[in-house]
From Swiss-Prot:
SUPFAM superfamilies: CNF1/YfiH-like putative cysteine hydrolases (SSF64438). Probably deamidates glutamine residues to glutamate on methyl-accepting chemotaxis receptors (MCPs), playing an important role in chemotaxis. The gene is cheD. The keyword Hydrolase applies. One of its GO terms (biological process) is chemotaxis. This is Probable chemoreceptor glutamine deamidase CheD. Its EC number is 3.5.1.44. HAMAP family: CheD. Pfam families: CheD. It is an enzyme of class 3 (hydrolase).
């Protein structure tokens, strides 16, 4: 399994603000939970999709860097198309029903200076809206685009999402983190292979 896809690599901690166990997702990660764990991440131009089956109270979050790309490049979870498939398929494996899944989507801020023509944040936001529409998954809440990075907490058991818009002082930090991840992933060796199951 590609290291960027491993859900057991997600950092878990006790969140003092909400007094609950939390799991902090970094770019390329996703996680599905069926308990009171808060899923949290910090977003600049990246997007996080929070999906939930309200009947089973199961939900998950992903964090992707770019809308689409070459899934065979060694780090496919950086791309929204693959990250969305991973999240949806994991939820379905755990018993979620596709027709009940609903979405809340966040991020896509244009925090990278100098990218005024077709910025990454805008492309990510457009992608997630189009993808979910094509999959017939309703978006019941969103906070996309703009210029501010965000920190979000998603509570899959209740469907609640808390969004904290970060001040401009955090823009450089979030943009630097996202740029560093993009640079690291662009140098990732091409890996992969085919496993045949009979």
């Amino acid at each position: 399994m590609n290291a960027s896809l491993r859900t057991d690599d997600v950092m878990r901690y006790q969140d003092a603000r909400f007094q609950t166990l939390a799991a902090k997702l970094l770019p390329t990660q996703y996680l599905v939970v069926d308990d009171t764990t808060a899923l949290t991440t910090t977003l600049g131009s990246c997007v996080a999709a929070c999906l939930r089956d309200p009947v089973l109270k199961i939900g998950g979050m992903n964090h992707f860097l770019l809308p689409e790309g070459n899934a065979g490049d060694g780090a496919p979870a950086r791309y929204g198309s693959y990250a969305m498939e991973l999240l949806i398929n994991d939820m379905l494996k755990r018993g979620a029903h596709r027709k009940r899944i609903e979405a809340k989507v966040f991020g896509g801020a244009n925090v990278l200076k100098g990218f005024t023509s077709n910025p990454v944040g805008t492309r990510n936001a457009e992608f997630v809206r189009q993808y979910l529409q094509a999959e017939h998954i309703p978006i019941i809440a969103e906070d996309l685009c703009g210029i501010h990075p965000r920190k979000i907490w998603f509570f899959a058991d209740t469907g609640r999402v808390v969004v904290q818009r970060l001040p401009h002082a955090h823009e450089a930090e979030v943009a630097a983190t996202e740029s560093a991840v993009r640079a690291r992933l662009s140098k990732a060796p091409v890996t992969g292979g085919v496993e045949l199951f009979e």
